[in-house]
Amino acid sequence: MTKKILLLGSGELGKEFVIAAKRKGQYVIACDSYAGAPAMQVADEFEVFSMLDGDALDAVVAKHKPDIIVPEIEAIRTERLYHLEQEGIQVVPSARAVNFTMNRKAIRDLAAKELGLKTAKYFYAKSLEELQEAAKEIGFPCVVKPLMSSSGKGQSLVKSADELEQAWHYGCEGSRGDIKELIIEEFIQFDSEITLLTVTQKNGPTLFCPPIGHVQKGGDYRESFQPAHIDPEHLKEAQRMADKVTAALTGAGIWGVEFFLSHENGVYFSELSPRPHDTGMVTLAGTQNLNEFELHLRAVLGLPIPEITQERIGASAVILSPIASKEAPRYRGEEEVCKETNTYLRIFGKPYTKLNRRMGVVVCYAPNGSDLDALRDKCKAAAAKVEVY
């Protein structure tokens, strides 16, 4: 049965979700704050407005009367989703989940205080003075982040008290929404970090994808690979934590649950997103029998999901813009990437550039049992051949 889906946020993840939805005969209205966003290029209709404007959001919902609302970004007046859900519209995964996960304070307190998950030690700060006091308790180095942000915006690794004032201002500048409050956490000496894609269903058990390893810079994803080779006991603990936190947040869909892994100290819950995850773009290489976007769509629609299996190993590496321009971006080097075997190039179709904006991704694959480190190197080398200008 065809459903009308209102997609809030139309970036590269939303684009892949729309493609999955269209393959199942769904009708999608893609929304974002700027025209020509990637998901708009493949949707049935689009709307351009600020999703932080609650009245504008209500007006778009009243106009299109969707069956399902699928948030793809954090910059949404999320409290409006509660009353839309009460009116009978399915919010993905749930209004509760979207509200909790867009605010690091809400999700961290739920995880650490209510559910008892192991997390980094943390405090909140509403002023520079509070930040300085918290840093004395935690020590250095420490991590400072806005309560509301994405893709590493406003995040700093602070190594001394002299850097706190700069971190305060940078955090406030990178904050989304109206709240100017930061979270300060101890820096975990981790050996690796993973994303555990977790699928909650309307009428089925919670499922887990093979763990995805990833490398970040400035809090933003640069490369990912699957499967991450981790201690089996660490994987069990991560699955236990992911199951617990997603059950508490309620709803059906895919979740990107992030963890720090330490050989010495075990598994730490970091954060989660109630939607397809950027590190999960590696699944576009066919690493699983169902990629993360197909899994999200099936969970949203209540369609059956078979056992998730690892079909082959994969790696992804991002293509960043070295410039900021309102002109349409151009690309060089695509031909070189296309010469590579078992390699896919994805240009997202963003209409303009920002410095270090993610403009595309290269994904590579190889048979199970192949050298994953060599595949990662191949993927990064291929991505480096693409120039944005």
Curated annotation (Swiss-Prot):
Residues 109-301 form the ATP-grasp domain. InterPro entries: ATP-grasp, ATP-grasp_carboxylate-amine, ATP_grasp_subdomain_1, PreATP-grasp_dom_sf, PurT, PurT/PurK_preATP-grasp, PurT_C, Rudment_hybrid_motif. GO terms for molecular function: ATP binding; magnesium ion binding; phosphoribosylglycinamide formyltransferase 2 activity; phosphoribosylglycinamide formyltransferase activity. It comes from the Bacteria. ATP binds at residues 104, 145, 150-155, 185-188, 193. N(1)-(5-phospho-beta-D-ribosyl)glycinamide binds at residues 12-13, 72, 278, 350, 357-358. Homodimer. Keywords: ATP-binding, Ligase, Magnesium, Metal-binding, Nucleotide-binding, Purine biosynthesis. Belongs to the PurK/PurT family. Pathway: Purine metabolism; IMP biosynthesis via de novo pathway; N(2)-formyl-N(1)-(5-phospho-D-ribosyl)glycinamide from N(1)-(5-phospho-D-ribosyl)glycinamide (formate route): step 1/1. Its EC number is 6.3.1.21. It catalyses: N(1)-(5-phospho-beta-D-ribosyl)glycinamide + formate + ATP = N(2)-formyl-N(1)-(5-phospho-beta-D-ribosyl)glycinamide + ADP + phosphate + H(+). It comes from Phocaeicola vulgatus (strain ATCC 8482 / DSM 1447 / JCM 5826 / CCUG 4940 / NBRC 14291 / NCTC 11154) (Bacteroides vulgatus). PANTHER family: FORMATE-DEPENDENT PHOSPHORIBOSYLGLYCINAMIDE FORMYLTRANSFERASE. GO terms for biological process: 'de novo' IMP biosynthetic process. It is an enzyme of class 6 (ligase). Mg(2+) binds at residues 258, 271. This is Formate-dependent phosphoribosylglycinamide formyltransferase.
